[in-house]
Amino acid sequence: MAQLDTLDLVVLAVLLVGSVAYFTKGTYWAVAKDPYASTGPAMNGAAKAGKTRNIIEKMEETGKNCVIFYGSQTGTAEDYASRLAKEGSQRFGLKTMVADLEEYDYENLDQFPEDKVAFFVLATYGEGEPTDNAVEFYQFFTGDDVAFESASADEKPLSKLKYVAFGLGNNTYEHYNAMVRQVDAAFQKLGPQRIGSAGEGDDGAGTMEEDFLAWKEPMWAALSESMDLEEREAVYEPVFCVTENESLSPEDETVYLGEPTQSHLQGTPKGPYSAHNPFIAPIAESRELFTVKDRNCLHMEISIAGSNLSYQTGDHIAVWPTNAGAEVDRFLQVFGLEGKRDSVINIKGIDVTAKVPIPTPTTYDAAVRYYMEVCAPVSRQFVATLAAFAPDEESKAEIVRLGSHKDYFHEKVTNQCFNMAQALQSITSKPFSAVPFSLLIEGITKLQPRYYSISSSSLVQKDKISITAVVESVRLPGASHMVKGVTTNYLLALKQKQNGDPSPDPHGLTYSITGPRNKYDGIHVPVHVRHSNFKLPSDPSRPIIMVGPGTGVAPFRGFIQERAALAAKGEKVGPTVLFFGCRKSDEDFLYKDEWKTYQDQLGDNLKIITAFSREGPQKVYVQHRLREHSELVSDLLKQKATFYVCGDAANMAREVNLVLGQIIAAQRGLPAEKGEEMVKHMRRRGRYQEDVWS
């Protein structure tokens, strides 16, 4: 074979790169998705092996004229998409299907038929980012080089597309509903026809559900006019067929009793572990951090040794919870299933495009305990659908009233913090035995993992992940009962068991802590890791300022742990300042003794500034301490410090953002608006980072 000269090699390299670009659509060098995320084989999903990624082809094959795409991180957007599909079918006769954005391609949307419509239900994740399953969709439409399959040179390639858009966001974040706003703006440049307004739901204001209900009615009216639809009386048409299988018992090895995947059911779980396939991790250590008896805060060490799971300092760990026994019993009792809890059921999608959210076959008990979000807040729209199945006329009238009057619903249900079963118990003691289980599967979202900021450094302990979590058990204003966190009380039960309690019952709750078929025995918990952009500067000599009251200190424990380890190796570590707040120094000062160890290792480079809100006549919070140390903060910012905030988004994070702008303006003799602009500039440059929740 003749030897290739340099030019030949260059030409071959160019051809190779071009071929890869063509066949992979550039995915090798696209902006990275979550490196820990996996699309995974979704149950009954549209994009299983052998299934098309061409949405137009899929709609033609299945006779659909309406597709509802969703971009969802926690399941809410997916739930809204399912509700829109169901309502469109039952009220207007649309042939609907629900579609996961990551399961389809978009290059052929320029050929989308004019007699069909596409919905886009898009949640915004974090700081204005797309959800994991919407990354490629977002990059495609917001990139500078959008290209479609059609050879037409038309400047408006999507002129045939009719679309509907609704966004899910949180106004406590700076980039409120950025996903739907940016996608809608990108669409408008391409020439499609939007039906109705681009709706926006606000979780930060607690009005997401009512925002959705208020938006969809005028949207349906506009869509009916555009597609010449006729509204009809909505009658329940099941999406799923649920049948009891008397030939199987719960002991049968093919029956799911809470296992998350088939490999877990078969006793051969294997990676890669992801949001679709958790690792059953041993809890290596657990202890209480508070010194008071009426409140709990947990420190847990989760072992990931041998799992091939990895994390980086600042990432999140997801815990897959189980519902408390009392809530499982309540739910089964309310719907007349208590005596049938161990009956085996098969669940099948009536429509070929329907995705079954629960592994099947399973039992009523397992479905409610492990797979359904039965403790979630109640949807007024879903409550209204139960009227037809009420046990008597009096109950039916009350349900109709609740479903029809949002203020009354707010008073009787929302303010009481009721879940579905509690809401129905407040109406009548009679069971709602006539409610089809298929309707409950359709109306109640799948039990979702809960995410926690990792409170350890991957440099210091790569095989163990630390969690710092306050246990929720509070009486909220207006509520007649204690509201108890689903996952934190589950973790508290595991901690109690590990520390010698044979019958743990945190706040009166019990859990199946040994898991399905005792597969979690020995104190195990299902987990996966989610990537975060909340990261230390790559140069450890750069100063950092951290603001983290309460459990908001979690990632900063990892940050400081890492900087102490780097210093011990002889690396130069820059000024490291933590503003920490809690109620009292002798009650809930998290890691109080540990900070002293890091102080010894980092010396003058570590400064911890505390704010105790209940120790003096005046409440003192971290934002007050920030203002008191304005000169220090300003000096470090001039040295290119990165500023971090972790904790409550609604109040603390918003006030810290405001105070920082005021500090910059005052210290530099600038107008207030200039200080605000400089904080925004820091955000854009990645020098102001938030890991916040509401």
Curated annotation (Swiss-Prot):
Catalyses: 2 oxidized [cytochrome P450] + NADPH = 2 reduced [cytochrome P450] + NADP(+) + H(+)
Residues at which FAD binds: 450-453, 468-470, 485-488, 693
Q: Which cofactors is this protein said to need? A: FAD; FMN
The residues on the Lumenal side of the membrane are: 1-8
Instruction: Quote the cofactor binding remark.
Output: Binds 1 FAD per monomer. Binds 1 FMN per monomer.
Segments crossing the lipid bilayer? 9-31
CDD domains associated with the record: CYPOR
Q: From the Swiss-Prot or TrEMBL record, state where the protein is found.
A: Endoplasmic reticulum membrane; Mitochondrion outer membrane; Cell membrane
Domain (FAD-binding FR-type): give its ranges: 276-537
Q: Name one GO cellular component term.
A: plasma membrane
Q: What is its EC number?
A: 1.6.2.4
Q: Which SUPFAM superfamilies match?
A: Ferredoxin reductase-like, C-terminal NADP-linked domain, Flavoproteins, Riboflavin synthase domain-like
- Gene3D superfamilies registered for this protein in UniProt: 3.40.50.360, NADPH-cytochrome p450 Reductase, Chain A, domain 3 (1.20.990.10), Nucleotide-binding domain of ferredoxin-NADP reductase (FNR) module (3.40.50.80), Translation factors (2.40.30.10)
Record: residues binding FMN: 72-77, 123-126, 168-177, 203
In this chain the Flavodoxin-like domain maps to: 66-220
Q: Which family does it belong to?
A: Belongs to the NADPH--cytochrome P450 reductase family. In the N-terminal section; belongs to the flavodoxin family.
The name of this protein is NADPH--cytochrome P450 reductase
> Source taxonomy lineage?
Eukaryota, Fungi, Dikarya, Ascomycota, Pezizomycotina
